[in-house]
Every structure is written in structure tokens, then in C-alpha cells.
């Protein structure tokens, strides 16, 4: 039984559906749904591959946002409760 783990879309106004924050938001929702699916179906390797692709896309967007605007990046990380990027 899959529970709806999606994050409330009220965080993002309708005008900003293409912004980096909204893209990270929607990718995070997909990550949560795929993670729940993989807990039930552990051998679904195509879904595992899809999860890795989504995670890499989200990471690219977060790297871009952290370089462009650190305050927006920090705010987004706090709202979505995801880990910060590893820095060298």
C-alpha cells in the first residue's frame, strides 16, 4: 500500500512553475514516490535506474542554484528537508 508522501505544492506559486526551486520540488516528490515504491519492490531495477537519474538531475539543479544564489539554495534546502551538497 503506497501512501501519498508528496510535499504540499503550496510552497510554489503558479507563476514560477519553471524556476529552479519548482523543478527541485517536483523532482523531490518523484524521489519520495519512487523510494516508497522501491521499498515494496526491491528488485525493480528499472525503477532504481530511474531514481538515480532523477537524483542526478536534482543534484545538478542544486549545484546550479548554490552557485547562483546561496540564500535561495539555503531556503529551499530548509523547506524540502533534504541534505546539503557535499563540498570539497
Swiss-Prot record:
Coiled coil: none annotated. Pfam families: Ribosomal_S15 (PF00312). One of its GO terms (cellular component) is chloroplast. Keywords: Chloroplast, Plastid, Ribonucleoprotein, Ribosomal protein. PROSITE patterns: RIBOSOMAL_S15 (PS00362). GO terms for biological process: translation. InterPro entries: Ribosomal_uS15, Ribosomal_uS15_bac-type, uS15_NS1_RNA-bd_sf. GO terms for molecular function: structural constituent of ribosome. HAMAP family: Ribosomal_uS15_B (MF_01343_B). Belongs to the universal ribosomal protein uS15 family. This is Small ribosomal subunit protein uS15c. The gene is rps15.
